[in-house]
Amino acid sequence: MTAAGPGIRKAAAVVLTVGLSAALAACGSEDGGGGDGGDHAGHKGAPKLSVSGAYVSQPPMDDMAAGYLAVRNAGGGADELTSVTTPLASEVTLHTTKGNRMKQVSSLDVPADGRLELTSGGDHLMLTNLTHRPKVGERVSFTLHFATSDPIEIKVPVEPTTYRPKD
């Protein structure tokens, strides 16, 4: 029986190695091109962001305007809006609003499977040092920058000061 022992051990080692290789291959990462971004085997998915409802309110002053939009995250991982750039303003800052108090912040959370809502009277973008006073109907380029996702470029319409989007 000792003569067969090393052969059996060798065969068992080969079977174990092949089995482990197959198991590890099955647990590999999903490819970066077009995966569904869902939760795979208990791992958080990547954020999947889209933007809707964006607009700039026509400013009553020449040097400052406000921007509003919604960022939808259909992915299983959270992200953060870290900055916004536009040729319309030399500076865009992110603001939260609690009660009557407005506070500048360095980022805004985009929750997994959730939305970030920037609305009039709520969290919003402040555009300062405008290059010109935008007029109703004009379209302004914005680039949204995130902590983990690629930047998103959008064209944003300028709406009347009294504009309120429909829900």
Enumerate the predicted regions with their spans.
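Compact, glycine-rich, soluble single-domain proteins
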Residues: G28-D31, D36-T148, I152-D167
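Hydrophobic helical h-region of N-terminal Sec-dependent signal peptides
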Residues: L16-L20
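Bacterial N-terminal signal peptides that target proteins for export
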Residues: M1-V15
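C-terminal motif of bacterial Sec signal peptides marking the signal peptidase cleavage site
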Residues: A22-A26
